[in-house]
């Protein structure tokens, strides 16, 4: 797939209209690419949200400045809820207890992956608090079903990476000795760009440690 989504930011409406027309002409004349009128347009970020790669954002006043406020996009949030609910149901399902460890590993991997991506949104903590309520609720309800393993509020955090990232959370739970990564425990992190020095044309590319967290890889395996 090609990365064909982009946003251009301008200070006023007239400049934005001119920039959009110039961009359309440039893409058509130089790259022979047609733009979609339905997906292209000008948005006033002081009044409305715009969505980009699963994140919706606008600007809000803060003192004498305007700052970005961003959330998970509505469609993205619904997809996350559906995916996590399906795995959580399998964890609770008495007939699937033989696959409990597999399902818990899948659930934890999904939660950590979603946190790693959506943490760039400034309001990600609020968004995942809502997701947590809809997916696991109070979670202790599982304890009323004697055929399921009880959810415990204390246990051992076996992964150093998870302990470093989630260890302070009071939302941690354990099932049959396996820890459940708290879906509602995430904070905003400023997005970082990939260093230009890390690419396949330079020797530094051989240092795979620049790109991959071995702690995460070890836990996933």
Language-model features and meaning:
Residues 1-221:
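Non-catalytic terminal/accessory segments
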């Amino acid at each position: 797939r090609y990365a064909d989504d982009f946003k251009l930011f301008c200070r006023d409406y007239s400049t934005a209209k001119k920039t959009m027309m110039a961009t359309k002409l440039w893409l058509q004349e130089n790259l022979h690419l047609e733009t979609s009128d339905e997906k292209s347009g000008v948005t006033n970020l002081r009044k409305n949200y715009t969505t980009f790669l699963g994140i919706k954002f606008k600007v809000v006043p803060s003192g004498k400045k305007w700052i970005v406020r961003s959330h998970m996009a509505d469609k993205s949030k619904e997809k996350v809820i559906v995916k996590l609910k399906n795995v959580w149901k399998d964890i609770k399902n008495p007939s699937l207890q033989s696959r409990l460890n597999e399902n818990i590993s899948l659930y934890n991997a999904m939660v950590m992956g979603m946190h790693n991506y959506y943490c760039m949104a400034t309001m990600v903590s609020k968004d995942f608090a809502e997701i947590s309520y809809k997916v696991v609720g109070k979670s202790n309800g599982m304890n009323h079903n004697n055929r399921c393993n009880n959810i415990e509020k204390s246990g051992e955090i076996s992964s150093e990476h998870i302990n470093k990232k989630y260890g302070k959370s009071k939302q941690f739970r354990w099932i049959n000795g396996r820890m459940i990564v708290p879906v509602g425990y995430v904070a905003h992190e400023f997005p970082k760009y990939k260093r230009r020095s890390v690419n396949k044309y330079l020797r530094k590319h051989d240092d795979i440690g620049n790109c991959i967290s071995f702690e995460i890889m070890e836990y996933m395996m």
